[in-house]
From Swiss-Prot:
Pathway: Protein modification; protein ubiquitination. Pfam families: zf-B_box, zf-RING_UBOX. This is E3 ubiquitin-protein ligase TRIM56. The keyword rRNA processing does not apply. The gene is TRIM56. Residues 392-404, 419-447 have a biased composition (Basic and acidic residues). A zinc finger (B box-type) spans 98-149, 164-205. A zinc finger (RING-type) spans 21-60. It comes from Homo sapiens.
Length: 755
């Protein structure tokens, strides 16, 4: 980049897009300069003129159109001079390959001159060798500079040609501009000087430039000073935004961990209370059964004695009654003396007592506080840290701790720990985790960036300028899954990096991602027609060559080969770019999704609503329609992936659903519920446990589904830095790679609830 104090070279002005119109993207024709100093073609400005005003396409400044039209905008003689130089270098007889002499037709009267070998920089004429030898032999031309034509067209004399080049008057062709009218500030030729400006004070151009250059240079120096201040302010603003995003990511992780800890504690309390309730009911039931057995025995004895006495009194004769009177009376008196109805045992009825804070809407377990961040000094030594270091640590120490009997209590780590190490300790049903166990679950064990003790963390540079948007939407709280068996996987930010490389001519448009080798990803950049390799840490590893003219769309890595779709064709190439085979696909859809099977020896591609599977030799192994023939014409799989369990997962834009099917096309599950927020389902990826990660580009989300296709909740949102996510892939079954529309890639580690 050219610094403010240096002057741009003529070669840069001629070779760059400086002479191209930013509207029609062609070389400028009749260039006109707006007051904002942006130059466009006169015809292009006429098309933009609306209601007597023109809005600059670059700076968006609106300027009024002069009453005479856009032709009255100031003519850019500087650009005209550069254009004349470019046209002069490119002119010539294209059929003969060499330009013709401009003087021979005038001297000899022929229609065409001889081949030109030289050029006069003052006359701007091409000359043959004979005319060039005598060109400087006259009083008017003895100071002219004649140079070799080959060197001139190669650009060797551009600087000298510019010095000798005279600007032409637009009103009088052939006349050079020589004067400046001081009252009118208008450039004049000799003819213009004699007409309306005859009585006006005029200066020669060289003298006028010497008089006015110091004022312009002073204004330029003032603007350069403003630019320095603006750059410094922009740098400070970017650093503040990076610190904000870094702190937001840190606080978001803390919120998720705190919410997860509270949920774990609540679930543990639920199990504990339900266990106490079951034990109480079982003990009460056992005691009640014993009492019931005793009462039933007494009842049977009394009922039998009463029945016997009743039969004797009803059916016995006098002698028989009197003979048994003593025995019956004794037994009945004995039974009457026993406690027939003992008082019931005390029965303690369970009652649930809820903490008042659970029902209090004003009780906030999580609360944010906002503090004005102080400017950060670059030369900080040990203990300086980032904005969110000691200050956020002190805030965490001042926060009230959530306590319960035998439950969870979030703890603050020491000041030297990074946010990823400052995990909120939680307890499972059998007890509390130790700090060492919690540290073992951080991404450091997987090769992530290690924290810098006491100094500025490395990851600030990774955050800086990466995440483009932070939504005001609250961070999603992942709850228990549908069967109630624990929590969902949650994301842990790993790294972020851009995919635009120095050799790219255009901004990347990532249309495909796939894992490639150990801890690498392969990126299909359709805009730059490249398959780029990156490590999980964002290191650029080069490219996999593709056939000339191919724009890779979707990509999948197989055993020692790469499959990708491009322009209704399926290609299989080796890592060196050699084409193994290609297959023509249906033209009925704009793009074809490609996915590798778990075995790595076959590739699946979506074609007009069905799935075709090819082996390494290019033979069609199988073909099926999700849902069978009954679904013919009813499917449109735009995104496709496979699961470690051997299932196919696709985003069906015709049914607006996510469909899961086996290798025979039998539908295992399908989701088309309100969790899609009315969006078309986007890219899909599957982790090692079968969880499905679905991208919803319109709402900046990645949601998670269970292996059967039931929606579980949000996994990533705009809070995590997502801005129009495009495609995703899963690496090693635990790293979710997400590409954004601006070419940036975010990587999140998928942390399972039982880890």
């Amino acid at each position: 980049m050219v610094s403010h104090g240096s002057s741009p070279s003529l070669l840069e002005a001629l070779s760059s897009d400086f002479l191209a119109c930013k509207i029609c993207l062609e070389q400028l024709r009749a260039p006109k300069t707006l007051p904002c100093l942006h130059t466009y073609c006169q015809d292009c400005l006429a098309q933009l003129a609306d209601g007597g005003r023109v809005r600059c396409p670059e700076c968006r400044e609106t300027v009024p159109v002069p009453p005479e039209g856009v032709a009255s905008f100031k003519t850019n003689f500087f650009v005209n001079g550069l254009l004349d130089l470019v046209k002069a270098r490119a002119c010539g007889d294209l059929r003969a390959g060499k330009p013709a002499c401009a003087l021979c037709p005038l001297v000899g009267g022929t229609s065409t001159g001889g081949p030109a070998t030289a050029r006069c920089l003052d006359c701007a004429d091409d000359l043959c060798q004979a005319c060039a030898d005598g060109h400087r032999c006259t009083r008017q031309t003895h100071t002219h500079r004649v140079v070799d034509l080959v060197g001139y067209r190669a650009g060797w004399y551009d600087e000298e040609a510019r010095e000798r080049q005279a600007a032409q008057c637009p009103q009088h062709p052939g006349e050079a501009l020589r004067f400046l009218c001081q009252p009118c500030s208008q450039l004049l030729c000799r003819e213009c000087r004699l007409d309306p400006h005859l009585d006006h004070p005029c200066l020669p151009l060289a003298e006028a430039v010497r008089a006015r250059r110091p004022g312009l240079e002073g204004l330029l120096a003032g603007v350069d000073n403003n630019l320095v201040e603006l750059e410094a302010a922009r740098r400070v603003e970017k650093e503040a935004l990076a610190r904000l995003r870094e702190q937001a990511a840190r606080v978001g992780t803390q919120v998720e961990e705190a919410a997860e800890g509270v949920l774990r504690a609540l679930l543990a309390q639920k199990q504990e209370v339900l266990g106490q309730l079951r034990a109480h009911v079982e003990a009460a039931e056992e005691a009640a059964r014993e009492r019931l057995a005793e009462l039933e025995g007494r009842e049977q004895v009394a009922r039998a004695a009463a029945a016997f006495a009743r039969r004797v009194l009803s059916l016995g004769r006098e002698a028989e009654i009197l003979s048994l009177e003593g025995a019956i009376a004794q037994r009945l008196r004995q039974l009457q003396g026993c406690p027939w109805a003992p008082g019931p045992a005390p029965c303690l009825l369970p009652q649930l007592e809820l903490h008042p804070g659970l029902l209090d809407k004003n009780c906030h377990l999580l609360r944010l506080s906002f503090e004005e961040q102080q400017p950060q000094k670059d030369g900080g030594k040990d203990g300086a840290g980032t904005q969110g270091g000691e200050e956020s640590q002190s805030r965490r120490e001042d926060e009230p701790k959530t306590e319960r009997q035998g439950g969870v209590q979030p703890q603050a780590g020491d000041g030297a720990q990074t946010p990823k190490e400052e995990k909120a300790q939680t307890t499972r049903e059998e007890g509390a985790q130790t700090l060492e166990e919690d540290r073992a679950q951080t991404p450091h064990e997987d090769g992530g960036p290690q924290p810098h003790r006491g100094g500025r963390p490395n990851k600030k540079k990774k955050f800086k300028g990466r995440l483009k948007s932070i939504s005001r939407e609250p961070s999603p709280a992942l709850g228990p899954n549908l069967d109630g068996s624990g929590l969902l996987p949650r994301p842990i930010f790993y790294c972020s990096f851009p995919t635009r490389m120095p050799g790219d001519k255009r901004s990347p448009r990532i249309t495909g991602l796939c894992p490639f080798g150990p801890r690498e990803i392969l990126v299909a950049d359709e805009q730059n027609r490249a398959l780029k390799r990156f490590s999980l840490n964002g290191d650029y590893k080069g490219t996999v060559p593709v056939p000339e003219g191919c724009s890779p769309c979707s990509v999948a890595a197989l055993q020692s080969a790469v499959a990708f779709s491009a322009s209704a064709r399926l290609y299989l190439i080796n890592p060196n770019g050699e084409v193994q085979w290609r297959r023509a696909l249906s033209l009925s859809q704009a793009s074809h999704a490609v996915a590798a099977l778990p075995s790595g020896d076959r590739v699946a591609v979506s074609v007009a609503g069905h799935v075709e599977v090819y082996n390494m030799e290019g033979s069609l192994a199988t073909r099926f329609i999700p849902g069978g023939k009954a679904s013919r014409g009813l499917r449109a799989l735009v995104f496709l992936t496979t699961s470690p369990q051997g299932h196919f997962v696709g985003s069906d834009w015709q049914q607006n659903s996510v469909v899961i099917c086996d290798g025979l096309g039998q539908v295992v599950g399908e989701y088309k519920g309100p969790g899609l927020h009315g969006c078309q389902p986007g890219s899909v990826s599957v982790d090692k446990k079968g969880y499905i990660f679905l991208t919803l580009r319109e709402v900046n989300k990645v949601v998670i589904l269970d292996p059967k296709g039931s929606l579980l909740g949000d996994f990533l949102t705009a809070y995590h830095g997502l801005e129009k996510p495009r495609v995703t892939t899963m690496v090693d079954g635990r790293y979710l790679v997400v590409s954004l529309s601006n070419g940036t890639i975010h990587i999140f580690r998928v942390r399972s609830p039982d880890s």
